[in-house]
């Protein structure tokens, strides 16, 4: 059987469905009328079109076909979807081209809003003027006399004009009540008005030949008969009434004019005006007028005030430091000149220029440092540096004398002998040896002044490299403090507090360099168990400069290790060593006042020290590791339990030779300080679980026994017996398989974890939407490119067509001219 072509099969199919062939057959006419309608015909055509165009249908074949299951989207019509997409893009492009270059907005057509040269008052005045113009053009006296409507029926009757929130009504506010007119004159005026109305009625209706009674009778008669008026009668009545009212108003105006002329002739109005002039209206002062009056008064006062003079601007820290350095250099030059005899005596003497007198900033700094020291003494009680006197009475008298001497020293100016030799400029030392050479020529009480002047002369903002030099100078001061603490002189400790304050100020800006220097000091002292007052000063500075509450600190942590090693490995066989150990324990307690980390060496040392001073044994755990040998020159005995809140001084740690009286006094003070330190340690460690075992030795100390029993009672009540951990019971492992009831083999994103399943679902949706968006963007870009190419081609075709048309027209004209030329030429040849 031969294979038929697709065109032939299409013709046969169309003919079979009665869509082609002869249509004017009589027998077929009845069949067509009773056959398919237009919708059926379109459906048949669409089926035939789909049948003969297999490329317009896309079917997604499945690997496994399951009967009875339809998958959505398995059959698609890419051609139709592409066509619909093209149409939608074409409509969107048309809308975009229509709106291209258009800018929407609201036009403000109010008076004066478009004029930027008018202020708000001018705008309101312009609006007011235009409103009055509209009123005058639409009503009032300019109305035609033949207008049928009344004056009160104009279109602008209900319109109200406002200005600054106040209504602008143009009614006359003339009130007769305040004119002083008596009742008789009022009655006379009422009679005049009544006569005027009566005269107007007579004149108006008489002129028109209309009787009011007759008009009323006609109206009543028509109302009684119930006959409807004709249009002509209604118009006549309206015209008559309008003319009547016009005539009435004209008569009233004439009557008023006559009365006015009569009053003018009798000089009545002049007398009335004089009476009105004599009446003084009471002025009402409102709150707004009072505010305006106060404003005007304040404005006049401001005008009369003197102009403020400009003050000097606030100077920066760098500028202040520069000025102070220049002052010091100038004073040093003057001092050198006076020393050489180059300056006259009447110019002033340098003996009166002491460091604390010549510069206010030094006094302010010292006062600030004293305040800072007082604040630090409140927080750091163990950092106080004072003497331990033989008895309390003597110490009180001595301290009173010292305070009196200090006040006298502050109130009186410095002596000539000390200030005359003190220079104003000093080189910044690079080592402790160089600093000793600089300060050796001056008294020790001038050391704070020397440090201040070095800081001012070498401020970090004055010269490059001064910051590093000051950091090195801070390290030199630390070495010098240790040097002063190790000296035997009593006066050395009086200036330590001032120098410590200077070091604390330098540590705020040079802490990294100082930390590295202190770590080197700690490493050098690590192998040595002997402690001097210099080491105690170093540990005190560490607690003042750095934070002791950090879990790990580059300086504090090594310092704590060195201090605990000293408490555990040193042999305390003398009063000075015991003082050094007690001072170290107090520093450690102060270190842990915030963090409260447990350091067992403190409690064990204090317990052993109290036992050695009282001559009793202790039952502390691991007590054998802390050796406290018998104290030389001291006979243990029952000490008087008298607590004190004073901290131990580091001065006695350097004293090697003590008298028996001093040993007795120091041992008593040592015992009191140890008991007080244990009390502070109990407050610090009262929350730890091992409190009863740690402070068991306090039962034998009367001052601490009650406190220990109270805290121990609560700690023992909080303890619970040791129990095993409670574990969750584990199920026995079984080999039975686990089935999922809602398992779906077609669901690729199945996951027993619901949260993870939701996450995967969101990711899949995001990926799908992203691919769809990218696909649409590509289609839009391709459509835009095709449209641009089509438009460019249309423009090019139009241009080429235009040029071809011009060329053709030119060629036509040239041909015509050429033919005319040839004809003329031929005719001339024939004439020859």
From Swiss-Prot:
SUBUNIT field: Component of the ribosomal small subunit (SSU) processome.
The name this protein carries in UniProt is Probable nucleolar complex protein 14
Q: Could you tell me one molecular function GO term of this UniProt entry? A: snoRNA binding
Keyword Translocase found = no
Q: Compositionally biased, Acidic residues: which spans?
A: 362-395
Family named by the database record: Belongs to the NOP14 family.
Q: Where is it chiefly localized? A: nucleus
Q: Which UniProt keywords apply?
A: Nucleus, Ribosome biogenesis, rRNA processing
- Whether Zinc counts among this entry's keywords is no
Give the start-end ranges of region Disordered. Answer: 1-43, 301-334, 362-422, 807-832
User: What role does it play?
Assistant: Involved in nucleolar processing of pre-18S ribosomal RNA. Has a role in the nuclear export of 40S pre-ribosomal subunit to the cytoplasm.
| GO CC terms, sorted | Noc4p-Nop14p complex; nucleolus; small-subunit processome
Single biological process term from Gene Ontology: ribosomal small subunit biogenesis
Low complexity bias spans: 411-421
**Where is the protein found, in the record's own terms?**
Nucleus, Nucleolus
Q: Where is the composition biased (Basic and acidic residues)?
A: 9-18, 815-825
């Amino acid at each position: 059987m031969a294979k038929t072509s697709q065109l032939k099969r299409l013709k046969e199919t169309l003919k079979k469905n009665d869509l082609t062939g002869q249509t004017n057959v009589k027998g077929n006419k009845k069949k067509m009328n009773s056959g398919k309608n237009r919708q059926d015909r379109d459906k048949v055509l669409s089926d035939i079109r789909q049948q003969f165009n297999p490329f317009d249908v896309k079917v997604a074949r499945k690997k496994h076909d399951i009967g009875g299951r339809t998958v959505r989207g398995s059959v698609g019509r890419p051609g139709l979807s592409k066509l619909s997409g093209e149409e939608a893009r074409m409509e969107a492009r048309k809308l975009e081209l229509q709106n291209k270059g258009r800018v929407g907005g609201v036009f403000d057509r109010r008076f004066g809003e478009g004029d930027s040269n008018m202020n708000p008052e001018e705008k309101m005045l312009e609006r007011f003027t235009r409103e009055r113009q509209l009123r005058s053009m639409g009503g009032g006296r300019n109305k035609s006399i033949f207008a049928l409507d009344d004056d009160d029926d104009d279109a602008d009757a209900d319109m109200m004009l406002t200005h600054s929130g106040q209504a602008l009504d143009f009614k006359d506010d003339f009130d007769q009540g305040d004119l002083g007119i008596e009742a008789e004159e009022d009655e006379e005026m009422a009679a005049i008005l009544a006569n005027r109305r009566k005269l107007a009625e007579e004149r108006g209706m008489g002129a028109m030949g209309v009787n009011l009674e007759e008009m009323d009778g006609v109206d009543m008669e028509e109302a009684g008969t119930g006959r409807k008026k004709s249009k002509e009668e209604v118009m006549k009545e309206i015209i008559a009434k309008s003319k009547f009212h016009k005539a009435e108003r004209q008569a009233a105006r004439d009557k008023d004019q006559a009365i006015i002329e009569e009053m003018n002739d009798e000089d009545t109005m002049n007398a009335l005006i004089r009476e009105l002039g004599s009446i003084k209206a009471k002025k009402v002062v409102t709150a707004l007028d009072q505010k305006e009056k106060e404003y005007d008064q304040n404005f006049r006062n401001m005008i009369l005030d003197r102009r403020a003079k400009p003050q000097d601007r606030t100077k920066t820290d760098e500028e202040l430091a520069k000025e102070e350095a220049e002052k010091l250099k100038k004073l040093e030059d003057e001092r050198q000149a006076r020393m050489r005899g180059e300056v006259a005596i009447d110019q002033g003497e340098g003996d009166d220029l002491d460091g604390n007198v010549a510069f206010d900033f030094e006094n302010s700094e010292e006062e600030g440092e004293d305040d800072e020291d007082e604040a630090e003494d409140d927080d750091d009680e163990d950092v106080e540096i004072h003497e331990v006197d033989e008895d309390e009475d003597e110490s009180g008298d001595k301290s009173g004398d010292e305070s009196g001497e200090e006040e006298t020293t502050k109130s009186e100016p410095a002596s000539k002998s000390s200030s005359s030799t003190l220079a104003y400029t000093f080189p910044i030392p690079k080592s402790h040896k160089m600093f000793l050479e600089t300060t050796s020529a001056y008294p020790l009480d001038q050391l704070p002044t020397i440090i201040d002047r070095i800081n001012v002369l070498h401020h970090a903002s004055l010269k490059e490299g001064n910051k590093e030099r000051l950091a090195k100078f801070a390290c030199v001061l630390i070495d010098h403090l240790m040097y002063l603490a190790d000296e035997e002189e009593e006066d050395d400790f009086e200036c330590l507090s001032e120098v410590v304050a200077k070091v604390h100020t330098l540590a705020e800006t040079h802490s990294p360099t100082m930390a590295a220097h202190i770590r080197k000091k700690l490493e050098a002292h690590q192998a040595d168990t002997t402690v001097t007052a210099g080491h105690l000063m170093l540990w005190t500075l560490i607690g003042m400069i750095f934070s002791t509450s950090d879990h790990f600190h580059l300086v504090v942590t090594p310092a704590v290790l060195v201090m605990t090693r000293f408490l555990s490995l040193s042999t305390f066989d003398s009063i000075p060593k015991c003082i050094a150990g007690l001072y170290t324990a107090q520093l450690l307690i102060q270190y842990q006042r915030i963090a409260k980390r447990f350091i067992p060496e403190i409690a064990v040392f204090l317990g052993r020290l109290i036992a050695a001073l009282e001559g009793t044994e202790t039952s502390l755990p691991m007590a054998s590791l802390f050796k406290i040998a018998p104290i030389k020159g001291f006979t243990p005995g029952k000490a008087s339990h008298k607590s004190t809140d004073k901290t131990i001084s580091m001065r006695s740690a350097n004293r090697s030779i003590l008298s028996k009286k001093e040993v007795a006094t120091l041992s008593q003070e040592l015992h009191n300080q140890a008991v007080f330190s244990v009390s502070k340690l109990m407050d610090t460690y009262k929350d730890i679980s091992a409190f009863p075992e740690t402070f068991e030795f306090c039962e034998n100390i009367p001052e601490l026994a009650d406190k220990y029993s109270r805290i121990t009672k609560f700690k023992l009540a909080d303890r619970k017996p040791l129990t095993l951990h409670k574990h969750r019971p584990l199920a026995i492992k079984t080999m039975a398989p686990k089935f999922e009831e809602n398992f779906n083999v077609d669901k690729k994103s199945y996951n027993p974890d619901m949260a993870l399943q939701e996450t995967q679902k969101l990711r899949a949706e995001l990926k799908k939407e992203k691919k769809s968006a990218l696909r649409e963007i590509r289609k839009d870009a391709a459509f835009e490119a095709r449209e641009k190419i089509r438009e460019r081609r249309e423009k090019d075709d139009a241009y080429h067509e235009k040029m071809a048309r011009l060329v053709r027209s030119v060629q036509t004209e040239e041909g015509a001219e050429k033919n005319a030329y040839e004809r003329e030429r031929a005719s001339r040849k024939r004439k020859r």
